[in-house]
Amino acid sequence: MKRNLKAIPVLVAGLFTSQLSIAAGSVSADPHAGHDMSAMQMPADENFTEMTSMEPIVTESRTPIPPVTDADRKAAFGNLQGHAIHDSAINYLVLLDQLEWQRSDNTNNFSWSVNSWIGGDTDRIWLKSEGERSNGETEAAEAQLLWGHAVGPWWDLVAGVRQDFRPASARTWAAVGFQGLALYNFESEITGFVSNGGKAALRLGGEYDVLLTNRLILQPSYEVNFYSQDDESRGRGRGLTDTELGLRLRYEIRREFAPYIGVSWNQLYGKTSDMAKREGEKDHQVVFLAGARIWF
């Protein structure tokens, strides 16, 4: 019995070795051995000859294409009128930029500033007006009629006349200048004036819209005026006469209608300041504002 138990491991090892030999032989053997594959052979030479005898693909036109002439271009793109290309459309805008109540030194004033135009993209007619009323009387009023011509994508050359109605007697000025958008969409204008009496003046102005939200807009603005000669009747001295810095916060209920509140700082300089003091007036003011901006 002990002799038989010792022989069991030897038998197991022999069986395992024989199984490995059989498996190795089956892998190395041809899997298609014994099968006749002669009937499945393809006539490779004949097919290759047929494929190489095909005509090459034509990549160029056999008929030469004639060069394009001016007559061809004219026939392809007809002569469009201004209406067809929307190039000569006449548009207009009326902007009541400032219609406001002002409060300073226990005085209530009403002020206005209007800019309107009609024309196309290149040439426009501008009508501007601004003024101020206090205690039921018009203290200052002027109007400008200008022709504007675009001299670039962002700037217009303007020329025309300005008429002063108040203060003092009426006065007519010739006007020429530039207006447009400076860097970062800063609306700017510079205009020179020459009166029928030989006096000259220069006005600089600008404003910028800061969008706090899509409808809440903060607008800083400035205006600076210079005169070439003293003008006692209008209370203006030679040189830098006055500056105005404004800050208005408006809310666009609709794009065409926006009420606002704000404040402005007005300062007189030089002889203009001296003239105001002789009349018992201050040469500086802080003015609180409330009004509306309307356009159509």
Curated annotation (Swiss-Prot):
InterPro entries associated with the record: Cu-R_B_prcur
Major subcellular location class: membrane
Localization, UniProt: Cell outer membrane
Gene Ontology MF, one: copper ion binding
Cystine pairs: none
Keyword Iron: no
Signal sequence region: 1-23
Topological category with respect to the lipid bilayer: Peripheral membrane protein
Pfam families assigned to the protein according to its UniProt record, in alphabetical order: CopB
Keyword presence, Kinase: no
One Gene Ontology term, aspect cellular component: cell outer membrane
Record GO biological process: intracellular copper ion homeostasis
Keywords: Cell outer membrane, Copper, Membrane, Plasmid, Signal
Domain of life: Bacteria
Function per UniProt: Required for the copper-inducible expression of copper resistance.
Protein name (database record): Copper resistance protein B
Native source species: Escherichia coli
